[in-house]
Amino acid sequence: MNTVRVTFLLVFVLAVSLGQADKDENRMEMQEKTEQGKSYLDFAENLLLQKLEELEAKLLEEDSEESRNSRQKRCIGEGVPCDENDPRCCSGLVCLKPTLHGIRYKSYYCYKK
């Protein structure tokens, strides 16, 4: 009976010590895989960033081409404050100093001609 106990104890000690070694190896392998995964993620992130920058450049180029070919579409309506130096009143309107209600605001408004 003692030999069975000694054999069992010996097998148990070997299993525990080898298990610890395997655990350390597994931990090191996981650490290496994590580091490799991080480098892969960094590479993928940089690639995605480059693609996004290219797309943004294309969109900005298209937008600038559009703005060169288009005229100003928005204008200021009647009775809306305007700047006397840069009037953006709609066609048929003129930027004038008001006669009554705008006097206290000291501003110009778009009025019909």
From Swiss-Prot:
Probable ion channel inhibitor. One of its GO terms (cellular component) is extracellular region. This is U11-theraphotoxin-Hhn1t. The keyword Signal applies. InterPro entries: Toxin_22. Residues 60-83 are annotated as: Disordered. Residues 1-21 form the signal peptide. Disulfide bonds join C75-C90, C82-C95, C89-C110. Keywords: Disulfide bond, Ion channel impairing toxin, Knottin, Secreted, Signal, Toxin. Residues 60-69 have a biased composition (Basic and acidic residues). Expressed by the venom gland. Residues 22-74 form a propeptide. Belongs to the neurotoxin 14 (magi-1) family. 01 (HNTX-16) subfamily. GO terms for molecular function: sodium channel inhibitor activity; toxin activity. It is found in: Secreted. The presence of a 'disulfide through disulfide knot' structurally defines this protein as a knottin.
